[in-house]
Amino acid sequence: MKYKDLRDFIAMLEQQGKLKRIAHPVSPHLEMTEIADRVLRAEGPALLFEHPVKPDGTRYDYPVLANLFGTPERVAMGMGADSVSKLREIGQTLAYLKEPEPPKGIKDAFSKLPLLKDIWSMAPNVVKNAPCQEIVWEGEDVDLYQLPIQHCWPEDVAPLVTWGLTVTRGPHKKRQNLGIYRQQLIGINKLIMRWLSHRGGALDYQEFRKLNPDTPYPVAVVLGCDPATILGAVTPVPDTLSEYQFAGLLRGSRTELVKCIGNDLQVPARAEIVLEGVIHPNETALEGPYGDHTGYYNEQDHFPVFTVERITMRENPIYHSTYTGKPPDEPAVLGVALNEVFVPLLQKQFPEITDFYLPPEGCSYRMAVVSMKKQYAGHAKRVMMGCWSFLRQFMYTKFIIVVDDDVDVRDWKEVIWAVTTRMDPVRDTVLMENTPIDYLDFASPVSGLGGKMGLDATNKWPGETDREWGRVIKKDPAVTAKIDEIWEELGL
C-alpha cells in the first residue's frame, strides 16, 4: 500500500470508505473528543472535521483530522501492510536488523540480499524545495491560536498538541531522534515540551545542555506527518536504522526531507505544518493537569518551554489531532497493532515464547501476558525478567503473567483459568521494589519509581513442587468425531 504523504493516505482511506468528512461546524473544545470517542468505540472511520469553530463562533482556516488510527486495520495500512497479521513480518525484519545472524552459507547470504538492498535503498532523499514550506509565518506573524488545537477533557488546563512529531539531535550525533510528546499551549508562540527524562528527545536535550549551558536548543515539531513516519517514531527501530529510513521501507518510497529554515534539523518535506524554534536555557513551566491514557487526570510537573520562532506549512494545511483517555483510545488501538510487531522481536531473543499480548485495558503497556514452551524449573521467571529488560517499551510494564503454550493469551477466560489453577500466590509471585515506573502512574509510592509483579501461571516442574501435578481433562477424539456426525440429527 504505497502512498506519498498524509493527503495521499487520506484519499486512499476515503476511496475505501474508511474516512468520513464532517461538514457540520464542530468545536475543538470538547466536542471533537466526544465525537471521536463514540466513533472509535464503534470501530468507525477516520474523521475530517472540515469546519472547526473558535470559541467566538468564527471558523478556523484549517480542517482537523481525527481518529486516523482508530482501528488496528488502519494502523496496519499506515505501516504498509494489508492486514494486522502481516505486521509480524515487519517485526521479523526488525528482529533481524536488531541482531543479524551470520549467513549459514552462500545460498543463505544471497537470500538476505534483497531485504538489505530494500532497506539501504530507502535512505532519505533531501530536497531543497518542499510543500511544507509553501507558507511561512515568522516573528510577529507566529500565532499558535490560529491552529485548531484540541481541548480534550473538561478539566484539562489548556489546549494540547497531541500528534506533534518532535525532531531533535544530540551533540555530535548524525542521526536525528523522532518522538511524540504532548505539548501544552501556553502562549501565542509557547508550548510546554512534556518529554520524560529517559525519552530520546529529553536525552538529546540533556546532552546538549551539558556542553552548551547558555545556548538555545533547536527543535522542530511536525504536525500532519505521513502515517509511516509517525508509526516509525513509536516502533522499536534498531539504533543502526533511522526512523526516516524505516518509514521509507514501510511506505515503499524514500522519505523526502527538507532542512528547516532556521536550523539544521531535517523534517518531512510533505508534512502539513512544521513548528521551528528553540528551548531556552532554564525556561520551564508547570504542565498539566491533563486527562491521559490511564483514564485519570495526571499530576502537574515542570517541563521545558518550546518557543516557536517560525511556522511553515502547505497551502490549505490539515491539522492532525487525537485525544487520550480511558481505553479504548487511539494509543490503545496502536498498542493492539504494534503488539504484532513486538512478538517476533521477543521471540528472536527468547525462542521459547509462543505469543505475547498487551491487553488494551491495561493502558497498552502496564500489563503483559506471555505464553511459552516451558523447558525447566524457573524458566517462567527468566522469561519475565527478559521481557522487562529487553525492549525499552516494557520498562514501565507493571504486571507480567506467564502461561504455558496451551493457553490463549488473548482470551481472559483461559488466562484466569491458568492463574487460578497453576499458581500458588506465595511461591509463584515475583515482587520487585523501586523499579522505573511511568511518572503518570499515581498509584506508585514515588513519582517515577514503583513496584513490579510477575505471575508464574505455568505448570510446575520437579523442583518447583513436590506434589503430583494435575492433568488437564481432554475429550476422546473418536467420541467427538462421532457426535459431530450425528449432531444435526439430535436437533440440538
From Swiss-Prot:
Q: What class of enzyme is it?
A: lyase
Q: Name one GO molecular function term.
A: 3-octaprenyl-4-hydroxybenzoate carboxy-lyase activity
Task: Tell me the compartments it is located in.
Answer: Cell membrane
State the pathway, as annotated in the record: Cofactor biosynthesis; ubiquinone biosynthesis
Chain positions recorded as Mn(2+) binding sites = N177, E243
GO biological process entries? ubiquinone biosynthetic process
Pfam annotation, one family = UbiD
- Which Enzyme Commission numbers does its entry carry? 4.1.1.98
The identity of this protein, by name, is 3-octaprenyl-4-hydroxybenzoate carboxy-lyase
Species name for this entry?
Neisseria meningitidis serogroup A / serotype 4A (strain DSM 15465 / Z2491)
